[in-house]
Structures are given as structure tokens and as C-alpha cells.
Regions:
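Conserved N-terminal phosphate-binding loop of PLP-dependent enzymes in the Aspartate aminotransferase
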Residues: 1-189
């Protein structure tokens, strides 16, 4: 059985490792990647074990394959990640963000599970009976947006605050986010 790791959202330093799968004790046969590789330029790729790649011998064609501009952007992104140590920065800033959310969780009982790796973190908002609280999430997201912070909505019930800030985010940026989030959460009814 083949195991494929989809790194479209989680790859390229997002989780405090170059690829999210590196946080676990498994090795995929195939990895698919996109989005962050181009930092806005349209590009995707896949890699595989050599025994799989060696079986791919038929010629193929792709309308969008081999684009030199996107390929150049991908190389520049990889260079930037390495030169600016963004894997480690994601781990450190992600810990700061997650620790800050856990501190808020102790203050606000409507924050349920806080989870994530690196700079891919979620905080679940719940009602007193532990049911999802999408209404609370809507208030928090919209009020934070009015303050200049974009926070995603996630989860089946749309009750999970989804934090995926830029990998270049600073300690001060995260402190500002957490301070504003604290103030907004103090207004949740």
C-alpha cells in the first residue's frame, strides 16, 4: 500500500519542520506540494521514492508543467526559507502563539481545544455544554478583522479559529495579536 503525504498547506516550514510529515515517525512514498512553494506564483510538485519514480517511464505532457517563471519562484522561495531560517522561526513563533492561546484558554472557558504545529494553530470555541460555538467565533473573527487581524474559520461546525500567519511574523506581531485577542475575547457573551 502506498502512503501519500499531502503537504499543500502544511509544507515548506509551516509546522516548524520543512514538511509536516517530519513531525511524525513515518516516511511517505509520495509527497504532493504546492501553494507555499511559489509564495503566490502558481506551482505544484510531487516527489516520490526512487522505486516509484523509476516506474514512471512513459512520456507525459502538462499544459502548465515546466513553467520557468514559476520554477524560478520556487527556487527563490526555498532559498529564502533556508537563508532566513524560517523552519526554526516557525517552530519558535508557533510555540509563542500556541502558549499564548493556552494562557487565554485558562482565562476564557469558551476556548476549548488548542492544537497545532508551528505556525499552523487552531483554537476551538465552545459553549458551556461543550458544543461548538460558531456564533462566538463569528464575533471574534469579525472584531479582530476590524482591528486589522485576519483569522481563518475552520472545523466542521466553523467554530475553530485558524491561525496561519506569515512565516516572517515577529515576536511583537504575535504579542499584538494575542493582546488584541484577549481584549476581544473579554467582550464575548
Amino acid at each position: 500500500m502506498l502512503f501519500r503525504s499531502d503537504e499543500v498547506q502544511t509544507g515548506f516550514a509551516r509546522t516548524g519542520k520543512m514538511f509536516a510529515i517530519e513531525n511524525y515517525d513515518v516516511e511517505p512514498d509520495i509527497m504532493t506540494m504546492a501553494k507555499a512553494l511559489g509564495n503566490g506564483a502558481p506551482i505544484s510538485c510531487f516527489i516520490s521514492r526512487s522505486e516509484i519514480a523509476d516506474k514512471y517511464t512513459r512520456p507525459g505532457a502538462s499544459t502548465l508543467g515546466g513553467n520557468p517563471v514559476s520554477s524560478t519562484a520556487g527556487i527563490a522561495v526555498l532559498d529564502y526559507i533556508e537563508e532566513h531560517n524560517l523552519v526554526e522561526k516557525s517552530r519558535v513563533r508557533g510555540k509563542q502563539l500556541k502558549d499564548g492561546l493556552i494562557a487565554l484558554q485558562e482565562k476564557y472557558p469558551f476556548i476549548g481545544d488548542v492544537r497545532g504545529l508551528g505556525l499552523m494553530v487552531g483554537a476551538e470555541l465552545i459553549n458551556p455544554d461543550k458544543s461548538p460555538a460558531p456564533d462566538k467565533l463569528e464575533f471574534v473573527v469579525e472584531t479582530m478583522k476590524d482591528r486589522g487581524f485576519l483569522i481563518g474559520k475552520n472545523g466542521i461546525a466553523r467554530n475553530v479559529l485558524a491561525f496561519q500567519p506569515p512565516l516572517v511574523i515577529s515576536e511583537e506581531n504575535i504579542n499584538d495579536l494575542l493582546n488584541n485577542l484577549d481584549d476581544v475575547m473579554s467582550q464575548v457573551k
